[in-house]
Design a protein with these regions (language model features):
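Surface-exposed amphipathic alpha-helices with a cationic face
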Residues: 9-16, 69, 92-96
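Acidic, Mg2+-coordinating phosphoryl-transfer loop and its flanking beta/alpha structural elements
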Residues: 84-124
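Short, acidic loop-to-helix structural element flanking the phosphoryl-transfer center
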Residues: 1-24, 30, 34
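A short, structured active-site edge motif that brings together acidic residues
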Residues: 43-58
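Conserved H-loop
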Residues: 43-47, 75, 121-124
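Conserved Lys-Pro-Asp/Glu-containing loop-to-beta segment of HAD-superfamily phosphomonoesterases
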Residues: 61-94
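Short beta->alpha linker loops
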Residues: 3-7, 28, 87, 107-110, ...
């Protein structure tokens, strides 16, 4: 059962208005991820939606993140910067495997301490902190 946490649309809108490129990287299969995002109108709030493959070539979070990077032309050597935002250990581990920091969302599905144990650089407890924490990260 999928839902959107209260305040997420407003936080995403603020980040988009401030010029951030936003992408969803999910381990849900792409063919499921896109319709779910469309149902909640997330497709209008982000720049891209990337999910796992049907042929099992892209299952793990780091594989999905790398696939998203390839599609958007992310180039760290050219100065591009990214931050993973997630609510499970798979997000933190996937970020680490791609050389990224992970901002943990304490309101999600993680067990207490899970995000910190897996290397999230910070865990926030309220949706209302999201945009400002991301903006602070990139200053």
């Amino acid at each position: 059962n999928n839902t959107i946490y209260d305040g997420i649309p407003e936080q995403l809108s603020k980040l988009r208005a401030d010029g951030y490129y936003l992408a969803i990287a999910s381990c849900k299969p792409q063919y499921q991820c896109i319709p779910i995002c469309e149902h909640f109108h997330l497709d209008t709030m982000v720049n891209g939606i990337y999910g796992a493959s049907e042929d099992n070539s892209r299952l793990d979070k780091d594989q999905v993140i790398q696939w998203a990077f390839d599609h958007i032309g992310f180039d760290e050597a050219a100065g591009d910067k990214a931050l993973m935002v997630g609510d499970r250990w798979t997000d933190a581990d996937g970020a680490k495997a791609c050389g990224l920091d992970c901002l943990g969302c304490g309101w999600g599905y993680a067990e207490p301490g899970e995000l910190k144990e897996h290397g999230a650089y910070k865990v926030i407890d309220s949706v209302s902190e999201l945009a400002q924490t991301i903006e602070d990260y990139f200053v």
